[in-house]
Amino acid sequence: MVLGCFALSLLPAITACSGDELPQPIKKPRTMLTLTTDWTGVDKGEKPNSYVVNINENQYTVENGDNVYELKTNESYAISSYTFAENITITDSIAKVGTSKTEVSSPTAINGLPGTLYGTYSRIDNLEGATSSLSLKMKQLTHDLNVTISNDVSVNSGYAVLNGVASSVNLKTGESSGSEDAVTEVRIATNAKGEQEITVPFRLLGLDKSATHTLTIYLSLADGTSKTIVTDLSSYLSNFGQTTAPLNIASGVALSSIISGVNNWQVVNAGTIKL
């Protein structure tokens, strides 16, 4: 009997609660963060129309100019920004070059001429205030190396392999890592005199400074024969990547005079090296 009265006494309370409005959810304060990318030092022609902003692994494709994000106040944020670069993928602020499409002896050989990569990283440990701003200084992360050989015979095609090349770079620190073979196709052009010029182009994230940087060039000649050129470029690459300008190296020896290797390389428009 007591149990029955207790049950009946609950009915009015349940009915009354069902008519009450639920409380509004608590909303955390927000900060409007304005992000600006600083392209100082980057040639106008190299500046892309769009790039990627990554905030705590949330990725946005944005255009140049100021971009505003509504973020939770009093939170920490890891922010990276980088350009789209062919044959380069970026995960957890690590940029990595894809594997070579040309089959060589090393199964882990990388593409020696990926797209040009610019990027940067910043961190906000405690975002405060109704509004805030952050400027991201974009840095050039790839560097060009061009090796040229004078050509007095006809070449149909070719490719080259450079040892001791970095396969990745950390956007947080700017430090490159890895030591792989990089593979690139040879470029054959005709100059104003009607002569062929052979250029071996590389675009690299960096070099393994402890490795020997041997360049091997494989050429298919028009007469059906082939030629392999092996040379050590280590001494010429000791300061590679310290400036944004390309490093251009040329040989003063004609192709027909090269038996197996080249010793008298000259650095062109990038400093002076005594040979």
Where are these regions (language model features)?
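Beta-strand secondary-structure signal
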Residues: 32-36, 78-80, 133-135, 144-148, ...
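Bacterial Sec-dependent N-terminal signal peptides
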Residues: 5-41, 266-268
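Conserved "repeat-terminator" motif of extracellular CCP/Sushi domains
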Residues: 26-28, 135-142
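Structural motif
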Residues: 34-48, 148-155
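Structured interaction patches on ligand/partner-binding surfaces of diverse proteins
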Residues: 87-133, 223-256
